[in-house]
């Protein structure tokens, strides 16, 4: 599988998402900003300077949700706060379920230094009316979030535990039956952002592994896509058939001057 380079020159790229017009949205965690790449290759800056945006999700009312120190709904240049919590460093990845509820993870550890003392974060659910529920804790470094195609299973990458936390999801959005999968795939390096394909398999960015790994729903490694970067940070499906995989990084080993890069499988 070949990789096409779509954008470069960023810091730590995160949050790839596509819309029905095949625009690609992504963020730069440390340099700051949220960007949109149109199908013709034009790149627009939508949000300037906002740092620690680890997750983006399209909003039914237009615009998108973005994380950072708070969860914000951005639309046509205006931003409103959806969720703010005391005592956290940042909200990181987030993902909607089929009913539009948002599942978002928190980070309480130092994002830039990742000091030895790590404070576990949580996963919250944001309801359609804006109310929130803490679903579970003990997520040391919260990363990618995704759902099985039928919405019955929630996947949540925890970088410190080197695997993916899994829960069953009820019709009311509640979670149960916590378990942990995929650790053998990340013996070197850590899992970061992720997405789930239409067959229910997980595609997980592997920081320190120079790849995206494909896992079965029970955590067995099925395949991998080599990526020319030490820090492969996230991935997302897009394209007319939702079969193009967009992969983002914090570096580029083929051309170090390009730094954080956006790739697409071809």
Model-inferred region functions:
Residues 1, 260-266:
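Sequence/structural signature of beta-propeller modules
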Residues 1-2, 41-44, 76-81, 126-133, ...:
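Beta-strand initiation motifs
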Residues 7-21, 49-68, 86-102, 108-110, ...:
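Beta-rich, blade/repeat-based domains predominating
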Residues 25-45, 71-72:
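Beta-propeller domains
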Residues 29-30, 109-121, 159-162, 207-208, ...:
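Short, solvent-exposed loop/turn segments at conserved positions within beta-propeller repeat blades
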Residues 33-35, 70-72, 121-124, 163-165, ...:
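A short loop-to-beta-strand structural motif that recurs across blades of beta-propeller domains
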Residues 167-174, 266:
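Short loop/turn segments immediately following beta-strands, especially the blade-tip
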Residues 172-236:
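Glycine/small-residue-rich hydrophobic helix-like segments
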């Amino acid at each position: 599988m070949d990789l096409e380079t779509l954008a470069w020159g960023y810091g730590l790229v995160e949050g790839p998402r596509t819309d029905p017009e095949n625009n690609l949205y992504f963020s730069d965690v440390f340099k700051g900003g949220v960007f949109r790449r149109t199908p013709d290759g034009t790149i627009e800056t939508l949000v300037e300077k906002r740092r620690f945006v680890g997750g983006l999700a399209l909003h039914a009312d237009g615009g998108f949700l973005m994380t950072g120190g708070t969860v914000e709904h951005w639309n046509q240049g205006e931003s409103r706060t959806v969720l703010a919590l005391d005592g956290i460093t940042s909200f990181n990845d987030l993902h909607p379920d089929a009913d539009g509820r948002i599942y978002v993870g928190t980070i309480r550890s130092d994002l830039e230094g990742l000091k030895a003392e790590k404070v576990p974060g949580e996963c919250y659910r944001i309801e359609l009316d804006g109310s929130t529920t803490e679903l579970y804790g003990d997520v040391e470094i919260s990363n990618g979030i995704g759902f099985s195609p039928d919405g019955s299973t929630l996947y949540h990458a925890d970088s410190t535990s080197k695997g993916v936390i899994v829960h069953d999801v009820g019709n009311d959005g509640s979670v149960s039956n916590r378990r942990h999968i995929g650790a053998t795939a990340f013996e070197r390096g850590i899992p970061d952002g992720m997405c789930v394909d239409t067959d229910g398999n997980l595609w997980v960015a592997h920081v320190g592994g120079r790849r995206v790994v494909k896992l079965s729903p029970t955590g067995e490694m099925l395949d991998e896509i080599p990526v020319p970067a030490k820090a492969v940070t996230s991935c997302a499906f897009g394209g007319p058939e939702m079969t193009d995989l967009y992969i983002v990084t914090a570096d580029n080993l083929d051309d170090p001057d390009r730094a954080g890069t956006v790739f697409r499988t071809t």
